[in-house]
């Protein structure tokens, strides 16, 4: 059994003055959400064996803050391929993951993240910024992952963690 974790980058700062969309940083609300997701992952034991992030500043920063706040670490690959990837492109990235990794976290962007959830599970959802989704895949090899094969394990929008709705002790 493999578990794919999809994390949409946290809320970005549209007024930052960044020269390009790729360089847009997180907003203060996004910083708080990324840290809350990281702590949630630590408390619940949802720690990836490996992470792959879009090279966009907001995606990389989301992952860095989550790891720091949660006190967990794993090998990280950064790729521009996830920046404008479609759902099928993400599926190719997933298929290239090492079979020694049982849980892989991929950090990226909407609408692709909603598309990969639907492609793998059939579930239609709009992923708000900072949302973490877990998809269980009944395979031994990442290369065997195919559309429709996944089961939605959980959806954690950051507001559950930042507004007191979910108490993590």
PLM region spans:
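Active-site-proximal alpha-helix that buttresses catalytic centers in soluble enzyme cores
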Residues: 2-3, 7-80, 85, 89, ...
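Short active-site-adjacent structural elements
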Residues: 15, 114-115, 143
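Short, glycine- and charge-enriched coil/turn segments that flank and shape catalytic ligand pockets
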Residues: 18, 100, 144-146
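A generic structural signal for short beta-strands and their flanking turns/coil linkers
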Residues: 22, 74, 102, 129-131, ...
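Non-DNA-binding regulatory cores of transcription-related proteins
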Residues: 96-131, 136-139
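Domain-level recognition of soluble alpha/beta enzyme cores
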Residues: 123-161
């Amino acid at each position: 059994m493999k578990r794919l974790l999809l994390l949409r980058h946290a809320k970005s700062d549209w007024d930052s003055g960044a020269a390009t969309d790729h360089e847009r940083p997180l907003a203060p609300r996004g910083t708080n959400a990324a840290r809350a997701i990281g702590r949630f992952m630590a408390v619940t034991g949802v720690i990836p064996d490996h992470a792959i992030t879009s090279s966009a500043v907001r995606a990389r920063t989301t992952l860095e803050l989550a790891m720091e706040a949660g006190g967990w670490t794993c090998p990280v690959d950064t790729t521009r391929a996830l920046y404008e990837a479609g759902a099928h492109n993400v599926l190719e990235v997933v298929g290239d993951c090492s079979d020694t990794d049982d849980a892989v976290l991929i950090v990226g962007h909407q609408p692709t993240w909603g598309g990969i959830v639907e492609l793998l599970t059939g579930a239609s959802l709009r992923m708000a910024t900072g949302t973490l989704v877990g998809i269980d895949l009944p395979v031994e090899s990442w290369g065997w992952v195919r559309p429709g094969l996944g089961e939605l394990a959980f959806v954690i929008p950051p507001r559950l963690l930042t507004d007191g709705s979910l108490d993590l002790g």
